[in-house]
Each structure stands twice: as C-alpha cells, then as structure tokens.
C-alpha cells in the first residue's frame, strides 16, 4: 500500500506541476493578448488623436482663410464706397465749376477734340449752361482756340445735350465726333482715376 501511495503522490505532484505550468502559460498568453490589445488600443487612440488634430488644423485654416477673405471683401466694399463718394463729389464739383475755371477748361477740351478730328470746322454741343457761356464769349472762345491750335477753326454752337458739363465736338456733317463731356472723360479715365483716388485715400 505504501508503494501505491507514493505512486499516487507522484502522479498528483506531476499533475499539480502540469496544472501550474498550464496556468502560468495561460496567464502569460493572456497578458500577451492584453498587452497587444493595449498597444492596438493605444495605437488606435493615437491615430484618432492625430486625425482629430489634423482635422482641427484644417478647420482652423479654413476658418482663418474665410475670415481673411471676408475682411478683404469688406475692405474692398469700403474702398469702393469711398471711391464712389469721391467720384460723385467730383461730378458735383465739375457741374458747378465757376466760370473763370470752366471757360479755359472748355477751350482745352475743345482744342483736344479738334486736333483729334483734324477738321477746320466743328459743331460744339453741351448743356444749356455751357452753351450760354460760350455764346456770350464766342469771339473770345474762338480766339483762344486759334492760339491753342495755331490755326483758325470755324465753330458753330449746336443744340443742348444732357450732360453735367464738358463738350461734345462734331464735324459739320455729324459723321465723326469726339465726346469730351465730363461723364465721358470720367468713364474713359476711370481706371486711372480710381487708382489715383485709391492711392490718395489708402496710400
């Protein structure tokens, strides 16, 4: 009986060792699985964080870009409003020029138009105020033109037109004209005018 008990004890001891070994290996494997899962979870978390940071940066840049665009748009709107105010004020100023400033300007504008037409006889048109001014000083006007051009020019006053001022000059047959009314000149030189106003206002 004693021998049998020893055998049983040995079997139990070996079984216990095997059980402990299996449990130890199982624990190691479980820990390994847990570690791998933790690493995967950490990597996943880091990936999610990086993605969120990237998306946040993209959104930040988008917001900044939109804000800059909106600021630029508002600035341009303000600049345009100010430029329009200046142009409107200029139109009003030109429409109310005193005679001593306006008359030599008419001589200059008519002279430029006559040079462009290359004609010895022209018809000049403008608003009623301007035609009345020229009618009252027609001889002086013709003399000033002759001095400016270095040759005689036959000038006929035409019918009134709608304009704030300046002059429209035509050949007698009305086939060719040069529009030197203030509106037309402002329109022709609007780009240069806007640039000059913008530089004066905004530097």
Curated annotation (Swiss-Prot):
GO terms for molecular function: ATP binding; proton-transporting ATP synthase activity, rotational mechanism; proton-transporting ATPase activity, rotational mechanism. It is a peripheral membrane protein. It holds the Pfam family vATP-synt_E. GO terms for cellular component: plasma membrane; proton-transporting two-sector ATPase complex, catalytic domain. Keywords: ATP synthesis, Cell membrane, Hydrogen ion transport, Ion transport, Membrane, Transport. InterPro entries: ATPase_E_C, ATPase_V1_Esu. Its main location: membrane. Transmembrane segments: none annotated. It is found in: Cell membrane. One of its GO terms (biological process) is proton motive force-driven plasma membrane ATP synthesis. Belongs to the V-ATPase E subunit family. Component of the A-type ATP synthase that produces ATP from ADP in the presence of a proton gradient across the membrane. Has multiple subunits with at least A(3), B(3), C, D, E, F, H, I and proteolipid K(x). This is A-type ATP synthase subunit E.
């Amino acid at each position: 009986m004693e021998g049998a008990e020893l055998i049983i004890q040995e079997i139990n001891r070996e079984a216990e060792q095997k059980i402990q070994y299996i449990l130890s290996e199982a624990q190691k494997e479980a820990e390994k699985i847990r570690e791998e899962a933790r690493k995967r979870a950490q990597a996943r978390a880091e990936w999610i964080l990086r993605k969120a940071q990237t998306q946040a940066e993209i959104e930040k840049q988008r917001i900044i870009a939109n804000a800059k665009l909106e600021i630029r748009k508002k600035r341009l709107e303000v600049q345009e409003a100010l430029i329009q105010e200046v142009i409107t004020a200029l139109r009003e100023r030109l429409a109310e020029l005193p005679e001593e400033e306006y008359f030599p300007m008419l001589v200059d504008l008519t002279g430029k138009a006559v040079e462009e037409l290359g004609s010895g006889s022209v018809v000049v048109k403008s608003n009623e105020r301007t035609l009345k001014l020229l009618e009252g000083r027609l001889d002086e006007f013709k003399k000033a033109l002759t001095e400016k051009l270095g040759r005689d020019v036959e000038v006929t006053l035409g019918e009134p037109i709608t304009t704030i001022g300046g002059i429209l000059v035509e050949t007698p047959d009305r086939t060719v004209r040069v529009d030197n009314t203030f509106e037309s000149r402002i329109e022709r030189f609007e780009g240069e005018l806007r640039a000059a106003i913008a530089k004066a206002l905004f530097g």
